Amino acid sequence: ALCNCNRIIIPHMCWKKCGKK
């Protein structure tokens, strides 16, 4: 699955890719 960092809710698996903690 692709990580969409533009979404308000981001899966915790995508946080690292999106730079979120």
From Swiss-Prot:
Disulfide bonds join 3-14, 5-18. GO terms for cellular component: extracellular region; host cell presynaptic membrane. The record marks 13 as: Susceptible to oxidation. Keywords: Calcium-activated potassium channel impairing toxin, Calmodulin-binding, Disulfide bond, Ion channel impairing toxin, Neurotoxin, Oxidation, Potassium channel impairing toxin, Presynaptic neurotoxin, Secreted, Toxin. Transmembrane segments: none annotated. Tertiapin-Q is a stable (non-oxidizable) and functionally similar derivative of tertiapin whose Met-13 residue is replaced with a Gln residue. Presynaptic neurotoxin that blocks the inwardly rectifying Kir1.1/KCNJ1 and Kir3.1/3.4 (KCNJ3/KCNJ5) potassium channels with high affinity by binding to the M1-M2 linker region of these channels in a 1:1 stoichiometry. It may block the potassium channel pore by occluding its alpha helix into the channel vestibule. Tertiapin-Q also inhibits calcium-activated large conductance BK-type (KCNMA) potassium channels in a concentration-, and voltage-dependent manner, in addition to inhibiting Kir3.1/3.2 (KCNJ3/KCNJ6) heteromultimers potassium channels. One of its GO terms (molecular function) is calmodulin binding. Oxidation of Met-13 results in the loss of biological activity. An amidation at Lys-21 is suggested in Ref.1. This is Tertiapin. It is found in: Secreted. Its main location: secreted. The record marks 12 as: Is responsible of pH dependence of the channel block. InterPro entries: Tertiapin (IPR049143). Expressed by the venom gland.
